[in-house]
Design a protein with these regions (language model features):
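A cross-family "folded-core" feature that marks the main globular domain of proteins
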Residues: 1-217
Length: 217
């Protein structure tokens, strides 16, 4: 789902991963400038923005710190935390994801109304929908812009697509559905006979929870 990221977020993620996968989560200033092909002012402003974003996302376990004597940057990260949490947060804020999430629950009379809802320009919304439709057609889905703007396709394909979309974007970090709690679905599933429901892994259990939530919408 990284293809959903806009260009600015892609550059932030590239910088984050460059530092994260370096030895001891530390990269020198020279490595970052050369490998990412950016200028020093861009490096400084991007790191400042990333740290602001991380705080805004609520992930206090992460931060990029600068070591002046060594001219290096280190990603401070708590144990058992994954950089994927930050990447997922950027994905959730991307125009493409915002469009898909918005169209799950509502249709719009025209593109202008949708563009206003997701805070994208009219030309931008047309571009994003065109690119999304290239992906959606492979799943027999599409965003229709005829009489109204809506996502169309058979119900089963829609539910599978959104269950997977939300599972990847939200993962185990948070639960995106306000109308039902995760533990309520757990109770429901545990009351089912083992012939119907048996989760052999955490990933499988989470996927089933998201799929059930989509059916309850």
């Amino acid at each position: 789902m990284r293809e959903y990221l806009d260009s600015k977020s892609q550059k932030k993620v590239a910088l984050l991963e460059k530092i994260f996968y370096a030895e001891n989560h530390t990269s020198t200033q020279e490595e970052l400038l050369n490998d990412l092909n950016i200028t020093y002012p861009t490096l400084i402003s991007t790191i400042k923005t990333i740290n602001f974003d991380i705080e805004r996302f609520g992930y206090k376990a992460f931060s990029i710190v600068h070591s002046a004597p060594n001219l290096s940057y280190t990603l401070k990260i708590s144990d058992n935390c994954s950089i994927q949490l930050i990447i997922n947060a950027y994905i959730r804020e991307s125009p493409k994801f915002q469009i898909l999430e918005t169209l799950l629950l509502a249709s719009f009379p025209n593109l202008q109304a949708l563009a206003k809802k997701v805070h994208v320009s009219y030309s931008g919304i047309k571009k994003e929908i065109k690119e999304l439709n290239e992906e959606l057609r492979e799943r027999n889905l599409s965003i229709s812009t005829g009489n109204q703007v809506e996502i169309t396709g058979d119900e089963f394909s829609l539910r599978i697509f959104y269950a997977f979309l939300f599972l990847v974007a939200y993962s185990g970090d948070r639960w995106p559905f306000s109308f039902v709690r995760y533990d309520e679905i757990t109770d429901l599933l545990e009351s089912c006979p083992k012939e119907i429901y048996r989760a052999n892994s955490i990933d499988k259990a989470m996927m089933i929870h998201y799929y059930v939530a989509m059916h309850l919408l």
